[in-house]
Design a protein with these regions (language model features):
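Extended, highly charged
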Residues: 1-194, 198-245
Length: 245
């Protein structure tokens, strides 16, 4: 497809972001956050509570100035606390392991209402030494404007809708799940990570973006990077005449 060709052409590219002083996503700053004020959804009857599924999770590398972005399910457990599933080999899980070895929390922002380029970058499989905010710029062809979070040292898209700021606590695992996954089955209760919320910022007229696991949006987001990866492998062993869209 045309999108696959464009992805393959741009996946080696980076476009540096631009740090700005303020942006729409920080029009309102809630220093005493209450997650119960947000419209989290109960996606399946067997889920153990409400989840954030459409959030792009952005974290800074513990030792280097680069940002990772990914999708991870986040279970609501208190007005200022979420349980987050993030395990190696996913890059966010590796970031957490690095921070935990230093007995430090991992600063993390959950971004709702990102641009399509940011969301596709978060779903990508680019190497861990690449910055996914810069990759989002390469995908869109435009320099992304970012702002620094209010309570943590993480950069987020200035034009997003909502940002939940916080820290993933070291050496803490608590029960999360069950959760209905894209496989049309439930993952069981497991020990996962505790995310302590420190602030919420948002537009004055912010909207909430939700993704149903296994729905069309979910499969499109996850499918394009995989399709491109398969396409690139085929190109290594086939002539141009052998490849059909």
């Amino acid at each position: 497809t045309q999108m696959t060709h464009q992805w393959s052409r741009r996946e080696e590219q980076q476009l540096p972001y631009k740090i700005v002083e303020s942006g729409p996503v920080q029009e309102v700053v809630e220093e005493e956050p209450n997650l119960y004020d947000l419209p989290l959804c109960l996606h399946s009857d067997g889920n153990n509570g409400k989840y954030i599924t459409g959030g792009v999770l952005i974290a800074k590398h513990p030792d280097m100035p680069m940002m990772n972005a990914s999708f991870n399910r986040c279970q609501l457990v208190a007005k200022d606390k979420l349980h987050v599933r993030m395990m190696p080999p996913q890059h966010l899980g590796i970031y957490y392991e690095m921070a935990e070895k230093q007995n430090k929390p991992l600063e993390l922002a959950i971004v709702l209402g990102s641009s399509p380029a940011m969301m596709y970058s978060a779903a990508s499989k680019i190497p861990i030494d690449r910055d996914e905010l810069e990759f989002a710029g390469a995908l869109s062809g435009e320099q992304m404007e970012v702002v620094r979070c209010k309570t943590i040292d993480v950069l987020v898209p200035a034009n997003a809708e909502i940002v939940i700021e916080g820290k993933v606590l070291p050496n803490v695992r608590e029960e999360e799940g069950p959760f209905g996954e894209f496989t049309d089955s439930y993952v069981p209760i497991m020990k996962n990570h505790a995310f302590q919320v420190t602030a919420i910022t948002h537009r004055k007229d912010a909207f909430w973006h939700d993704i149903y696991a296994g729905g069309r949006e979910d499969l499109n987001l996850l499918g394009l990077p995989i399709e491109s990866e398969v396409f690139n492998h085929i190109r290594k062993f086939a002539t141009p005449e052998d490849i059909l869209d």
